[in-house]
Amino acid sequence: MSGGGPSGGGPGGSGRARTSSFAEPGGGGGGGGGGPGGSASGPGGTGGGKASVGAMGGGVGASSSGGGPGGSGGGGSGGPGAGTSFPPPGVKLGRDSGKVTTVVATLGQGPERSQEVAYTDIKVIGNGSFGVVYQARLAETRELVAIKKVLQDKRFKNRELQIMRKLDHCNIVRLRYFFYSSGEKKDELYLNLVLEYVPETVYRVARHFTKAKLTIPILYVKVYMYQLFRSLAYIHSQGVCHRDIKPQNLLVDPDTAVLKLCDFGSAKQLVRGEPNVSYICSRYYRAPELIFGATDYTSSIDVWSAGCVLAELLLGQPIFPGDSGVDQLVEIIKVLGTPTREQIREMNPNYTEFKFPQIKAHPWTKVFKSRTPPEAIALCSSLLEYTPSSRLSPLEACAHSFFDELRCLGTQLPNNRPLPPLFNFSAGELSIQPSLNAILIPPHLRSPAGTTTLTPSSQALTETPTSSDWQSTDATPTLTNSS
């Protein structure tokens, strides 16, 4: 579930409870081997829900109406105050459309500043083991928002909140505000993340075409995947790994084709040398090193997942539909062949002596339909590599020839609308891999001197953040979950 509401479908997540936040209310995540959760329609049933692990919300806690910043915990570093319950008692969700709920919330980005925020038209659009997602309308601007409400452990900072507060990119769902509210039980505290609302998900868009026995237009595949890779390049430059890339977590506006990555409930700032849990990411999209139990993985697990999403859009179904953790590896081997000893060592050195059945790789051209563009197949094969370091980086993927059509002047969406903003790179984005900039910036947006032309167009380079915007900073030391 997400800004777009519940979607159902998709594979189950990890065996521990997972927050499949926005796009999909989780059914029960499979235990142990991570069997498919729930039973809703779509390939693999519903994904499991995952409780947002990690750290509890930092900084000033904004209470519900009347509580004041910090509530009983006090302002500043005193922690969040519970305030009143949200939604308030007596509000009949979906019925009392004119009733206004007012809370004191903290701005999602920038300096910690609290203000009163009023909502109307509150209704549930998804739920799971992690909590509930509501849709609401801001009373002042009439803008729709999604409110993700999760039970908060007062001992920890909330990792999802910490990460979302530092992210600011056009292809990432924006945190507008956050506030805390009390629950029905004594000392129960909830964190409410107020997020921009995006109506659809890539999962539901793809399912629409599949049900109609149609193939999703290749230009939409290009536009969606390009924006996904751009969002990954940004978060990876911040040291953040999403760890749950799947179609259900890719929000899209069906009219403009703008894509926004959502659900950072599994995301983590990866630090070299520090171990991470391997049982992460929804099964169909899990990188092989995770299946091998690696704990020192890198952000390239997101690239593998993105490769699975690309393949799924091209095929009309998941490329690796494993029934369990072990079967997931079998599905991968059926396509890529048995990994070599060196590839296994790169994924997890502890498995080098394990005996695997020797299976030859299936030719990529036979994996996909005959009409699949060769550039799409080439990109897929460069993403779905056993060796993590051999996978393309997200920006290298953006620069791939598969996306050249997007860089051509005059290219439009199939609905005859202009392309969404694809080239409004910030200085920070252009500093990630400068050698790629000559490809990433289309010729028609370059000045004669070779620099980017500054124009009012949404396709041009516009923002220039300070260097501090691109520092990967750790949260204030506190008791935290290291998974």
From Swiss-Prot:
What transmembrane ranges does the database entry give?
Answer: none
Keyword Transferase attached: yes
Q: Which residues form the active site?
A: 244
Q: Which SUPFAM superfamilies match?
A: Protein kinase-like (PK-like) (SSF56112)
Q: Quick check: keyword Calcium in the entry?
A: no
**Where are residues bearing N-acetylserine located in the sequence?**
2
Phosphotyrosine, modified sites: 279
Ranges annotated as biased composition (Gly residues): 1-15, 25-82
| Any one Gene Ontology cellular component term annotated for this protein | cytosol
Q: Which reaction does it catalyse?
A: L-seryl-[tau protein] + ATP = O-phospho-L-seryl-[tau protein] + ADP + H(+); L-threonyl-[tau protein] + ATP = O-phospho-L-threonyl-[tau protein] + ADP + H(+); L-seryl-[protein] + ATP = O-phospho-L-seryl-[protein] + ADP + H(+); L-threonyl-[protein] + ATP = O-phospho-L-threonyl-[protein] + ADP + H(+)
GO MF terms here are: ATP binding; protein kinase A catalytic subunit binding; protein serine kinase activity; protein serine/threonine kinase activity; signaling receptor binding; tau protein binding; tau-protein kinase activity
User: How far does the signal peptide extend, from start to end residue?
Assistant: none
Q: What is its EC number?
A: 2.7.11.26, 2.7.11.1
Modification(s) after translation: Phosphorylated by AKT1 at Ser-21: upon insulin-mediated signaling, the activated PKB/AKT1 protein kinase phosphorylates and deactivates GSK3A, resulting in the dephosphorylation and activation of GYS1. Activated by phosphorylation at Tyr-279. (Microbial infection) Dephosphorylated at Tyr-279 by M.tuberculosis PtpA, which leads to prevention of apoptosis during early stages of microbial infection.
A Pfam entry, by short name: Pkinase
Q: Where is this region: Disordered?
A: 1-96, 449-483
Task: Tell me the InterPro entries matching this sequence.
Answer: GSK-3, Kinase-like_dom_sf, Prot_kinase_dom, Protein_kinase_ATP_BS, Ser/Thr_kinase_AS, STKc_GSK3
Activity regulation as described: Activated by phosphorylation at Tyr-279. In response to insulin, inhibited by phosphorylation at Ser-21 by PKB/AKT1; phosphorylation at this site causes a conformational change, preventing access of substrates to the active site. Inhibited by lithium.
Q: What does this protein do?
A: Constitutively active protein kinase that acts as a negative regulator in the hormonal control of glucose homeostasis, Wnt signaling and regulation of transcription factors and microtubules, by phosphorylating and inactivating glycogen synthase (GYS1 or GYS2), CTNNB1/beta-catenin, APC and AXIN1. Requires primed phosphorylation of the majority of its substrates. Contributes to insulin regulation of glycogen synthesis by phosphorylating and inhibiting GYS1 activity and hence glycogen synthesis. Regulates glycogen metabolism in liver, but not in muscle.
Assembly and interaction partners? Monomer. Interacts with ARRB2. Interacts with AXIN1 and CTNNB1/beta-catenin. Interacts with CTNND2. Interacts with LMBR1L. Interacts with DDX3X. Interacts with TNFRSF10B. Interacts with RICTOR; the interaction results in phosphorylation of RICTOR at 'Thr-1695' by GSK3A which facilitates FBXW7-mediated ubiquitination and subsequent degradation of RICTOR.
Q: What is this protein called?
A: Glycogen synthase kinase-3 alpha
